[in-house]
A protein has these predicted regions:
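Sec-dependent N-terminal signal peptides
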Residues: 3-12
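Alpha-helical interaction segments
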Residues: 4, 16, 24, 219-220
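Juxtacatalytic substrate-recognition/specificity segment
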Residues: 16-166
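Acidic/His/Gly-enriched intrinsically disordered linker/tail segments
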Residues: 21-22, 91-93, 111-115, 123, ...
Length: 299
């Protein structure tokens, strides 16, 4: 009985990881393309968010030639001393913490304009890349093997083999997802390549500490490693746009939507006629040459 009580207590603790603020009253309104949800004292932020979202809608959707089938939900929260945004692209929902972000590793940008555009690009680009639509996030092929039956009254023998092969519904690596979300669209000015970002990339370049192509395809790093995935992805997306045209970013996403395409390396090759690893080598060589010239001026 004691173990049952302990189990129930632990279940309650881990089942309530976030306080849901039951004291708040929530409100909603709709615009042409969005459903906006906000709570007490956040109406001004919600109204501004709606204006921003409608302003950037055509730019983002035309860049990727894709529109959501339904209105996108935007939830505005201002309950914590915290700033962030999240895109739930299978749910067609964006959550925004309204407080402006003061992030030392990036320059100063207008918060709501920046974060709403960033997250909406996630919604559009990742939905564009889906192989099976928003209703099927993935699938598994499984095979189970069994020992030979030893008794006539037993239908199956003891299971001795399990083969499971996951089939993801999206296969966009972090560097590309975050890189194009920071790039946003042609002529976008809410987020820019600022001196803070350049400092991080320059330091890694001149100290031969750039992340590898495989490393920028995952998160889970220490220190500024995760930020460097954002940073390098943004720089690489800008490089692709400059060298091959911004349409290449959309075409890579389209290629990754192919049900049989699960390699960004091959997707890049099919679009740019150069595989991802060689593209990244060219990108690194360009960075080294550029920063060598710049640092020679101050030596």
């Amino acid at each position: 009985m004691r173990l049952v009580i302990i189990f129930l207590i632990i279940s309650v603790i881990y089942g309530q990881p976030k306080y849901n603020h039951p004291e708040l009253d929530w409100y909603s309104f709709e615009t042409e393309h969005f459903k906006i949800h906000y709570h007490d004292d956040a109406e001004s932020s919600a109204r501004e968010a709606a204006t921003v979202a409608e302003h950037i809608y055509d730019n983002v959707t035309s860049f990727y030639d894709y529109e959501p089938k339904e209105k996108t939900h935007i939830v505005l929260k201002d309950t914590d001393d915290y700033s962030n945004g999240a895109a739930y692209y299978y749910d067609n929902k964006i959550v925004i913490w309204a407080s402006p972000l003061n992030f030392e590793l990036r320059g100063s940008h207008r918060w709501l304009q920046n974060v709403i555009t960033h997250e909406f690009v996630h919604i559009i680009s990742l939905q564009k890349s889906m192989k099976m639509g928003t209703k099927i996030p993935g699938a598994y092929f499984q095979y189970m093997g069994y020992e030979e039956e030893k008794r006539k009254d037993v239908l199956y023998g003891y299971p001795n083999m399990l083969v499971s092969y996951p089939i993801p519904g999206t296969s966009v690596p972090p560097w590309l997802a975050e890189g194009i979300a920071q790039y946003m669209y042609d002529e976008a000015s809410w987020d820019t390549w600022d001196t803070h970002r350049d400092m991080i990339l320059r330091d890694r370049t001149i100290n031969n500490n750039l992340l590898s192509f495989d490393q920028i395809s995952t998160f889970g790093k220490k220190g500024i490693g995760n930020e460097s995935t954002y940073n390098t992805g943004y720089a690489l997306s800008r490089y692709i746009s400059y060298k091959y045209g911004s349409i290449a970013l959309k075409n890579i996403i389209i290629e990754l939507s192919n049900p049989l395409q699960y390699s960004v390396n091959d997707a890049i090759h099919n679009v740019l006629d150069i595989d991802g690893y060689h593209l990244y080598d060219d990108f690194k060589s360009t960075l080294k040459e550029r920063y060598k010239k710049l640092t020679n001026l101050v030596e």
